[in-house]
A protein has these predicted regions:
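Active-site or pore-adjacent capping/gating segments
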Residues: 311
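C-terminal alpha-helix plus adjacent terminal tail
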Residues: 26-52, 56-237, 244-254, 286, ...
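CoA-thioester-processing core
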Residues: 1-32, 231-293
Length: 399
């Protein structure tokens, strides 16, 4: 095994590679130093002793050893051996700057370098029992919606590099959404009952997609307006955002509101191991409890209480709201993208430092900076000259 980037390329061994060596594999730091700077790597029994691998097997017994290991791991699983759930292609309708899914819409404004991401709750009553949830399969709202959201985030990240700001909106019936998620949580065994494998996997997918949004290097601003559906897991979108503006419109038939549920009490943890509410109100359990107190009776948090509770950044009336949102969008897109990537990555991950937060909340942005330094990609940089007979020339100043 080897990670030869430092001695050969003058950069780091993959995003988080070093962190995984010491945090995940538990390799001693001085041995990790040797491993990371020896181009030929570490072989055989030494790799086992240094905890880089679990075992070594000769070529003649390698397949047998792998098979035995796989069987031992399989015996620990409580997943049944029956049929899985087929996931059909999402096949969104892409029309110019708009990508339209069943429950998600992504609209790009390339000129302003902004995007609008709208996520919709279920339009009909969802299955409420374990069997009916499983029978719904890939058409289950939670599974379909979060697959679409995942796809939209990936399209945004990979195809629209110059888009720097995303407005988050939600639509739908909050009660239908809360009913659907309550049934899913029950089926997944979060209340202490028997966990159904399918419901659990759907819940884990939801957790991963929220984490993907957490580590997406775009400014996110949530807009809570009359007709929004920031309830349950969709409220997590609100607390993933870098800012949240709420419209207080006294003339609206239904005021802008936020509804919390058991989904916000730790079912979808961040990479730091805390819920988004716990991260928002770090070491302030009283504030977390005050927000979650609205959950049992599904009491809506309306504008009057939202700012007092701290669940949004600002509440503005119908006169100030449009201008304040517009000014924020204009100001944010005028700032340095590099500075914002570093700032947002640090501010989003308050609380405990974990392997996940080190890799995605710190190293991704930091390592990209190292890759653009002259020592890596300059005319005499290690990456530029890799494979040539010339030796790189380094600026030896530590920064």
């Amino acid at each position: 095994m080897s990670l030869p980037e430092v001695p050969l390329l003058g950069v780091l061994p993959g995003t988080g590679g070093l962190t995984r060596v010491v945090d995940k594999r538990k390799v001693r730091r001085d041995l990790a130093d040797v491993f990371s700077t020896v181009a030929e790597g570490v072989k055989g029994q030494r790799a086992v002793e240094w905890k880089l691998v679990d075992a070594v097997a000769p070529k003649s017994k390698f397949e047998e050893a792998v098979s035995e290991r796989a069987k031992a791991l399989a015996q620990k699983s409580d997943r049944p051996g029956g049929n899985g759930v087929k996931l059909d292609g999402l096949r969104p309708n892409v029309d110019g700057n708009s990508t339209q899914y069943r429950y998600v819409t992504l609209t790009i404004d390339a000129g302003r370098r902004t995007a609008e991401l709208t996520v919709r709750g279920p339009s009909e009553v969802q299955p409420s029992t374990v069997d009916s949830i499983r029978n719904k399969g890939a058409e289950l709202w939670a599974l379909r919606c979060y697959r679409e959201l995942d796809d939209a985030l990936l399209r945004l990240r990979l195809n629209h590099l110059e888009v720097g700001l995303v407005t988050l909106r939600t639509e739908g019936n909050p009660q239908l959404l809360l009913d659907a998620e309550a049934a899913l949580l029950e089926a997944a065994g979060t209340n202490g009952g028997q966990a159904d494998w399918f419901a659990r996997e759907v819940l884990l997918l939801m957790k991963r997609v929220h984490k993907r949004l957490d580590v997406t290097s775009r400014t996110f601003v949530a807009l809570i307006e009359p007709g929004s559906c920031f309830a349950g897991s969709f409220a997590e979108l609100l607390w993933s955002a870098d800012r949240a503006y709420m419209l207080d419109d006294p003339d609206a038939d239904t005021p802008a509101q936020i509804l919390v549920s058991a989904m916000n009490a730790g079912a979808l943890p961040m990479g730091n191991g805390l819920s988004r509410l716990e991260t928002r109100f770090l070491d302030d359990s009283a504030s977390v409890k005050a927000v979650l107190a609205y959950a049992p009776e599904r009491k809506a948090i309306e504008p009057d209480d939202a700012e007092k509770l701290g669940v949004v950044t600002f509440v503005r009336d119908d006169i100030d709201y449009p201008d304040e949102v517009r000014l924020f969008l204009e100001e944010r897109t005028s700032l340095s993208p590099d500075a914002l990537v570093g700032m947002e990555a640090n501010l989003r991950f308050a609380g405990p430092e974990t392997m996940e937060t080190k890799i995605f909340g710190r190293l991704s942005a930091w390592q990209n900076w190292i890759f653009t330094r002259a020592n890596a990609t300059g005319n005499k940089g290690a990456l530029t000259l890799y494979g040539s007979p010339e030796r790189p020339e380094f600026d030896l100043r530590r920064c």
